[in-house]
Amino acid sequence: QKTGIPRAAVRRCLYTLSKLGFVYAEDGKNFQLRPRILALGHAWLASTPLARSAQPVLRHLSEMLNESCSIATLDGDDILYIARASSSRIMTIDLDIGSRLPAWATSMGRVLLSHQPEEKLNDMLARVTMIRYTPQTVDSVAKLRAELKRVHQQGYALNDQELEMGLRSLAVPLFNAQGQVQAALNVGVHAGQMTAREMIERVLPELQKAARELTLLLR
């Protein structure tokens, strides 16, 4: 009804999608999505100009640090992963292109939120449910606001085991030609591999260098 497409045509489309493994209907009438449909979204995300152009830079950064690197954008109250280069190290948190995480609780999300207009940020903070994922998690809006202010001033966000114990991540912004933050770049490490101070001393300069390269691609 919403698309104006005849019922017969819709049935034919659904039949084709069913044969391709994207949908199914146990009763032959009520169709549901299969997990395979996610591949279509992943393919689209991976083919966006930023994701496509960024992949060589991400791979180089990941190989140099031997750590996983990602790029994400803000999508509603979440961050959406649009590009990723994984290291050989096994990470406890399973992330891929298309993965979503709550923006307020992640390093990339805080970088992105720290550059949002005040009104938009206020609306988001009014909606968010702050879950205490670990004993390290920021647990109040007031503390989060203070952290976002610090992130904006220093130009990077360090998430020290707030989303998951044993996981540290460091993120920096990616600016477009208008000087607006379009995405964020991060590196995630096992806490046992590197201290927070070591991340800032060793990883941050390389992360900022990669961000400058990627920012040029956005201009």
What are these regions (language model features)?
Residues 1-47, 51-52, 212, 216-217:
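N-terminal helix-turn-helix
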Residues 16-22, 36, 70, 81, ...:
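Residue-level recognition of specific faces of alpha-helices
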Residues 174-177:
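Sensor-regulatory modules in signal-transduction proteins
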Residues 53-61, 125-171, 217:
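Short, basic/aromatic recognition patches
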Residues 29-128:
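Amphipathic alpha-helical effector-binding/dimerization core
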Residues 182-219:
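Juxtadomain coupling helices with adjacent low-complexity linkers
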